[in-house]
Regions:
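Walker A (P-loop) phosphate-binding loop of P-loop NTPases
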Residues: 56
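Walker A/P-loop NTP-binding motif
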Residues: 60-74
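Inter-Walker segment of RecA-like/P-loop motor cores
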Residues: 88-146, 245
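Pre-P-loop entry segment of helicase/translocase ATPase cores
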Residues: 1-47
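Walker B catalytic acidic pair
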Residues: 151-155
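Conserved RecA-like ASCE P-loop NTPase motor core of nucleic-acid helicases/translocases
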Residues: 77-89
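ASCE P-loop NTPase helicase motor core
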Residues: 157-231
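ATPase catalytic-site recognition across NTP-hydrolyzing enzymes
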Residues: 217-285
Length: 288
């Protein structure tokens, strides 16, 4: 065995990919270990599924669960998982996915070159999962895929994501269950919002967005949320704790303004004080 290929997880029959694990029982065990929003994502049958999640909410584990489920439902076909960049495939996806496969004793074979890919060995047969970077999304053009999973899609430039999305959907033309699943912490009004959050998107019947809060994950350190609350402003907390779509680039001061606390009708004696005036040169009306 070369360092570019390896086998993992309870290959009890050395040199063989045989497994007697009951696939339905395996998927039931995986689902039982998920918290409710993860289960909602796992159970979703829409063609396009989004997961908008706070930090530490468990979105990567949700994607790992979905990757195994879709692989089991598409025996003999090919799926793909995508991270924003190639290093993130190695640093995030491969580490977490292999731990997941080992935890559930799912036999697999990994090939690192020329591009990383996993083959999962089920009782009914094999299923392949390609690992690709979203920055090089065009590499999947020409493939017939059953499913595509994308992690941290809001980190990708909206120009690239918007161009790649319809092309990737065009690859979903094989297998028994064809799905596009994307998970990310929302970064303002980017791809997740445009695809799931607009009024037009909400009227579509082919897609659904699931929101997952940081506090939904019972496995986080007890002080994790408290530390975030102590260091993030309200807008960032709405996005990074609750998975909400908020403006993270403009209007940061305005959202904290309240007339009761910041406006007064009394005029203190300031005759001897220097006069300081602040002006906000807005796009439309100027405020002083």
């Amino acid at each position: 065995m070369s360092i570019l290929n390896r086998e993992g997880s309870v290959l009890d029959h050395v040199g063989s990919h045989y497994t007697d694990i009951d696939t339905d029982e395996l998927l039931d065990r995986i689902r039982a270990d998920l918290h409710p929003p993860q289960q909602q994502f796992f159970d979703n049958q829409n063609e396009i599924v989004g997961l908008s999640a706070g930090y530490g909410a468990g979105k990567t584990r949700a994607l790992c669960s979905m990757a195994v489920k879709l692989a089991a439902q598409n025996i003999g076909f090919i799926g793909a998982v995508m991270e924003p960049t190639a290093p993130l495939i190695r640093d995030i996806w491969q580490t977490d996915f292999e731990l997941f496969l080992e935890q559930y004793e799912i036999p697999y074979t990994f090939r690192a070159s020329p591009l990383p890919e996993y083959t999962m060995h089920f009782k009914e047969g094999d299923s392949k999962l390609l690992c690709r970077s979203f920055e090089n999304w065009s590499r999947i053009i020409g493939l017939n895929l059953s499913h595509v999973l994308v992690d941290e899609i809001d980190v990708v430039s909206p120009v690239i994501a918007d161009k790649a999305f319809p092309k990737i959907l065009g690859r979903l033309r094989a297998g028994n269950v064809r799905q596009f699943c994307a998970a990310s912490t929302p970064e303002g009004f980017r791809w997740l919002y445009n695809t799931f959050g607009t009024d037009e998107a909400k009227e579509r019947t082919d897609r659904e967005l699931i929101k997952m809060r940081t506090q939904d994950n019972p496995h986080l350190p007890s002080d994790f949320i408290e530390r975030m609350q102590a260091n993030y402003d309200p807008s960032m907390l709405a996005a990074y704790l609750n998975g909400e779509f908020v403006n993270l680039t403009t209007g940061m001061v305005y959202s904290r303004f309240t007339r009761e606390q910041n406006v007064t009708n009394s005029k203190p004696d300031i005759g001897l004080e220097p006069l300081r005036i602040g002006i906000d040169f807005n796009i439309q009306n100027t405020n002083a």
